[in-house]
Amino acid sequence: MALLELSELNQLPKVERVMALAEINNRLDKLSAEDRVLWGLENLPGQAVLTSSFGIQAAVSLHLVTRQKPDIPVILTDTGYLFPETYRFIDQLTEKLDLNLQVFRAEQSPAWQEARYGKLWEQGVEGIERYNQINKVEPMNRALETLQGQTWFAGLRRDQSGSRAHLPVLAVKKGIFKLLPIIDWDNRQVYQYLQQHGLSYHPLWEQGYLSVGDTHTTRKWEPGMAEEETRFFGLKRECGLHE
């Protein structure tokens, strides 16, 4: 497949644009995760970036992508409310994989936000969405602009939540190509990859956490809970970056 140009794709009538992406995804569905990364690096335009929350399975995508592009910018949007274990995990993986880590934060400090707005995460869906906009979405948009990212790799998987169940390998999001190399992996494949390459889950995985974000909106998994119920009090699954 020839190098994809977003401008050319956008010039197509909507039906043809959808069909073109569907055809590409049909081919990508048949490729391994490693080959999807290779295809993306060879065929998608401009600066590639990789995002990571340094969550439970973060080591998989970080290792998978940086094996093929060691200097790819790895974007972390740091809310200032991550678990201590997460900050240590970030340090460990950054050193182990020699990551080109790029950290972006809200323009207001956590303390200033609390003084101005109170604890937004305790203010229902509207408060959580405002919190995410300030601490996740705006810093991410600034990161993409600063780094001039045109191709975005991320480690989402369909079996993580209902909101991700139908995501394609390749999509166009806000004028940027977004490629999800392990979108169709299950927990067994994640485990096998980590074992094969001497990598670890996030340290809180052993304490019963299936998904890890901020300290105030993350819960341990309990019997009967869906994975998405462990985040944001079950009110929503996404932090705004992948909606």
UniProtKB/Swiss-Prot annotation:
E.C. no: 1.8.4.8
Record's GO cellular component terms: cytoplasm
SUPFAM superfamilies, A to Z: Adenine nucleotide alpha hydrolases-like
Any single biological process term in GO: hydrogen sulfide biosynthetic process
Main location: cytoplasm
Pathway terms, separated by semicolons: Sulfur metabolism; hydrogen sulfide biosynthesis; sulfite from sulfate: step 3/3
Keyword Ribonucleoprotein in annotation: no
A single GO molecular function term of this UniProt record: phosphoadenylyl-sulfate reductase (thioredoxin) activity
Keyword match Oxidoreductase: yes
Keyword terms, alphabetized: Cytoplasm, Oxidoreductase
InterPro entries reported for this sequence: PAPS/APS_Rdtase (IPR004511), PAPS_reduct_dom (IPR002500), PAPS_reductase_CysH (IPR011800), Rossmann-like_a/b/a_fold (IPR014729)
Active site residues per record: 239
Family recorded in the similarity comment: Belongs to the PAPS reductase family. CysH subfamily.
HAMAP family membership: CysH (MF_00063)
Described purpose of this protein according to its UniProt entry: Catalyzes the formation of sulfite from phosphoadenosine 5'-phosphosulfate (PAPS) using thioredoxin as an electron donor.
Name of the featured protein: Phosphoadenosine 5'-phosphosulfate reductase
Lineage: Bacteria, Pseudomonadati, Pseudomonadota, Gammaproteobacteria, Enterobacterales
Gene: cysH
